[in-house]
């Protein structure tokens, strides 16, 4: 057998580079226009809606849909995804798995694959489902990994996979997600809903009524570039207005953040530096000032809250650790001077104050605490339910805060079996294991099967599953501690991945099936996840490249293997499904929105329902807390949760508290050995790991072909590092290479590598360096607490040095090493 590193043009006979990639990556747009005519088609994406110029069966050019007045530059990366050298082109099977089956786990990750036919691949997939259900039972199959997928109401790859696999047999699934695992678990106890995915007070109400806006670990200018559905970018119009008000001194905006983030640089607002992972200590001191100086809203606390009298003794040092949470106490932890803490507390109650929290601070050890304590602060300020006051946990996400029109978006493909239907293997014996596990504890399950953990008031017994099915999801991006993952994956017998790009998850799989991108199929999607601005027709722009197929086609073929394909499809093809979803949507909106017949909508490409009515979160509760009670056990804001207290957890008790971290920079545990905090926040130029494969767009920010690591110039100088140097970042969990970018936006002791950088190990061995710069090579795989058991990615300290020696090639991109 010959072994060659796959190049993009390999195996494509009698074609030129231009005919495969499309001229837009090789020639200028003006040159294309001179030689082509073609057609324009409307489609959409997480990055926004656009019109695509199609000529010769290829996408030549993209331009933002005219409704989007603030398009993101990431639209420039879409062609790079579609025509990426990292596309999964054919069904592939890992060579050693095919030769030795499960006994080859030690070579998993060596990226050596052999091409097979579609029939062979589906047969192998089905054979493994049969073997696992027969040999072990449903506890041995995990099909619950989920992610952002691609946009589109019909082609939801997770739903399509889980319906097909569920028709065959039961399986292990998950609860929660990586983005907001701690927040969505704690907030129902405190404010009665997850809050993180709830519509927030309209931006117009904030702009008209707020005197102070606190952006707490929140970077909306960066994060609002993308959306769960097709993004409208309406939020940026409000941010433009906010910038004007900041410049005129009409609104006081403060960013509480270790770094000067993109939003702070855009708004030119005040920045309050705080040591990483110390927000709760800072907030407790703020509460101390508000209470001892009698600045808090006593009437609001008495009318709308429960448990303040149990919480305040902790602040005063009369319970629990018996330490008074004074500004002097907090200053030694958070790095904010005592008088600055006092001034900040007084500012919070000087006028109408809107707290806007981001998600990063709940992705750390004890991540439940800052969100809970934020709600306590908002309650003490007393403005929850007022225009321009209170607290939000989502104004950086998917256009939350843009007034909703009330449009009911289209439904989707059914995830579950039809009512009354049973799977082929109707076995509900999970061998004493839990059927559902916390989303971030699946690696622990593989490594420690049978281990019992606490989770949200229940006991979970981790299942030692043997097989995974992963569809349109990249856990080798979003989970923590790559070397721990390598050890776990050596225990798995079979991993099947369905995707359009050859991610690290494909590298560590056994069977890889090529799905097509969202621009190679037909669909519809809501335009605006929360605003309900309209509906987008997602036209297929080009035919599926290589041998890729839609998830619908792939899973239909799988169900055909056990005679359930008609039940799976309900007798409809792609366009019949799309039409039916549109017609159901039209019926659901009768009397509210005039929607044309499907053909007219499909030809036009979009519907625009305008802007909705401004709204204030929790206003009804404030107006009448008895009639409009919250969803908490008491119906009130629970400063103290007696329900959580009854759980008896060590790391999440009955009210918010300061807990020291397992590791922390700036004088915290472990900082003598690894003194730098690694911030691995959402990227500025990707959606998580989506678009990292777009070569031309990646080149606009990569440094020597690697992911950037952002470093304070003084920290870099101390280590002999200049802008553009290669840097080795390391701790006891792993090591990576990244390209240095020096910036005063980052304080001493803090570095940033944005998550979503594709993992590219030099070898499959445990401990191998990541050649591109995936920060999760270094992060800690630890549950936030017994309550949420969510990811603690931002509890991570490291060291770094200038890289010396022979520079290894980047192994993240370009697909497998194909054995022929």
Curated annotation (Swiss-Prot):
Give the molecular function GO annotations.
electron transfer activity; molybdenum ion binding; molybdopterin cofactor binding; trimethylamine-N-oxide reductase (cytochrome c) activity
Residues given in the record as Mo-bis(molybdopterin guanine dinucleotide) binding sites:
179
- Which superkingdom heads the taxonomic lineage of this protein's source? Bacteria
Swiss-Prot/TrEMBL keywords = Metal-binding, Molybdenum, Oxidoreductase, Periplasm, Signal
Q: Where in the cell is it found?
A: Periplasm
EC annotation from Swiss-Prot or TrEMBL: 1.7.2.3
Names of the cofactor(s): Mo-bis(molybdopterin guanine dinucleotide)
Q: Cofactor note, please?
A: Binds 1 molybdenum-bis(molybdopterin guanine dinucleotide) (Mo-bis-MGD) cofactor per subunit.
Is Amino-acid biosynthesis a UniProt keyword of this protein? no
- Post-translation: what modifications? Predicted to be exported by the Tat system. The position of the signal peptide cleavage has not been experimentally proven.
| Protein family | Belongs to the prokaryotic molybdopterin-containing oxidoreductase family.
Protein name as annotated: Trimethylamine-N-oxide reductase
């Amino acid at each position: 057998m010959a072994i060659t590193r796959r190049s993009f043009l390999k195996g494509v006979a009698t074609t030129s580079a231009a005919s495969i990639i499309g001229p837009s990556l090789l020639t200028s747009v003006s040159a294309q226009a001179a030689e082509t005519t073609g057609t324009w088609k409307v489609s959409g994406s997480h990055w926004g809606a656009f019109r695509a110029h199609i000529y010769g069966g290829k996408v030549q050019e993209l331009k933002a849909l005219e409704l989007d007045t603030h398009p993101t530059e990431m639209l420039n990366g879409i062609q790079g995804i579609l025509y990426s050298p990292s596309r999964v082109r054919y069904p592939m099977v890992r060579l050693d798995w095919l030769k030795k089956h499960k006994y080859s786990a030690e070579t998993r990750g060596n990226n050596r694959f052999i091409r097979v036919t579609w029939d062979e691949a589906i047969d192998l997939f089905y054979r493994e489902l049969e073997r696992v259900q027969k040999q072990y039972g449903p506890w041995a199959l995990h099909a619950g990994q989920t992610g952002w997928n691609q946009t589109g109401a019909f082609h939801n790859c997770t739903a399509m996979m889980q319906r097909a696999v569920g028709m065959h047999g039961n399986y292990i699934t998950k609860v929660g997600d990586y983005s907001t695992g701690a927040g969505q678990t704690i907030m129902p106890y405190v404010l009665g809903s997850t809050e993180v995915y709830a519509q927030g007070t309209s931006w117009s109400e904030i702009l008209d009524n707020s005197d102070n806006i606190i952006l707490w670990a929140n970077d909306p200018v960066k994060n609002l570039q993308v959306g769960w559905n097709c993004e409208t970018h309406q939020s940026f119009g409000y941010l433009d207005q906010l910038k004007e008000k900041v410049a005129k001194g009409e609104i006081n905006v403060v960013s509480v953040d270790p770094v000067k983030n993109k939003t702070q640089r855009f708004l030119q607002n005040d920045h309050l530096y705080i040591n990483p992972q110390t927000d709760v200590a800072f907030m407790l001191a703020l509460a101390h000032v508000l209470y001892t100086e009698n600045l808090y809203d006593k009437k609001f606390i008495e009318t709308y809250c429960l448990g303040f009298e149990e919480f305040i003794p902790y602040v005063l040092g009369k319970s629990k650790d018996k330490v008074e949470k004074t500004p002097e106490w907090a200053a030694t932890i958070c790095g904010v001077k005592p008088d600055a803490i006092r001034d900040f507390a007084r500012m919070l109650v000087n006028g109408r104050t809107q707290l806007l929290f981001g998600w990063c601070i709940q992705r750390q050890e004890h991540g439940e605490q800052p969100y809970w304590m934020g709600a306590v602060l908002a309650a003490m300020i007393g403005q929850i339910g007022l225009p321009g006051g209170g607290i939000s946990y989502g104004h950086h996400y998917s256009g939350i805060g843009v007034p909703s029109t009330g449009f009911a978006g289209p439904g989707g493909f059914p995830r579950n079996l039809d009512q009354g239907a049973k799977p082929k293997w109707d076995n509900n014996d999970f061998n004493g294991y839990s059927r559902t596990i916390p989303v971030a504890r699946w690696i622990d399950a593989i490594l420690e099967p049978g281990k019992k953990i606490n989770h949200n008031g229940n006991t979970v017994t981790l299942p030692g599953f043997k097989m995974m099915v992963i569809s349109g999801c990249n856990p080798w991006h979003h989970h923590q501690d790559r070397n721990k993952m390598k050890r776990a994956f050596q225990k798995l017998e079979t991993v099947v991945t369905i995707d359009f790009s050859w991610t690290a998850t494909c590298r560590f799989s056994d069977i890889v099936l090529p799905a097509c991108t969202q621009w190679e199929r037909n669909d519809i999607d809501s335009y605006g996840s929360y605003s309900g601005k309209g509906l987008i027709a997602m036209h297929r722009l080009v035919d599926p490249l290589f041998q890729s197929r839609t998830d619908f086609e792939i899973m239909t073929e799988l169900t055909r293997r056990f005679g359930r394909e008609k039940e799976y499809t309900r007798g409809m093809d792609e366009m019949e499904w799309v039409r039916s979803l549109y017609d159901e949507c039209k019926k659901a909106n009768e009397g509210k929105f005039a929607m044309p017949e499907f053909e007219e909508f499909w030809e036009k490409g979009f519907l625009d329902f305008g802007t909705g009515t401004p709204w204030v979160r929790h206003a009804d509760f404030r107006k009448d807390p008895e009639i409009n009670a919250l969803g908490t056990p008491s119906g009130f804001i629970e400063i103290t949760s007696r329900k959580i207290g009854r759980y008896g957890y060590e790391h999440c008790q009955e009210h918010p508290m300061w807990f020291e971290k397992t590791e922390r920079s700036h004088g915290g545990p472990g900082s003598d050995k690894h003194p730098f905090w690694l911030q691995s926040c959402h990227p500025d130029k990707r959606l998580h790991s989506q678009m990292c494969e777009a070569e031309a767009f990646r080149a606009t920010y990569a440094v020597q072909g690697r992911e950037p690591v952002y470093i304070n110039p003084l920290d870099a100088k101390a280590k002999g590092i200049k802008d553009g140097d290669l840097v080795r970042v390391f701790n006891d969990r792993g090591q990576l290479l990244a390209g240095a970018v020096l910036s005063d936006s980052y304080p001493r002791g803090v570095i940033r590598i944005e998550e979503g950088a594709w993992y590219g190990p030099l070898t499959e061995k445990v401990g191998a360096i990541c050649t591109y710069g995936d920060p999760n090579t270094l992060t800690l795989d630890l549950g936030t607490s017994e309550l949420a058991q969510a990811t603690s990615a931002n509890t991570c300290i490291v060291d770094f040095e200038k890289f010396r020696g022979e520079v290894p090639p980047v192994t993240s991109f370009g697909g497998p090493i194909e054995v022929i």
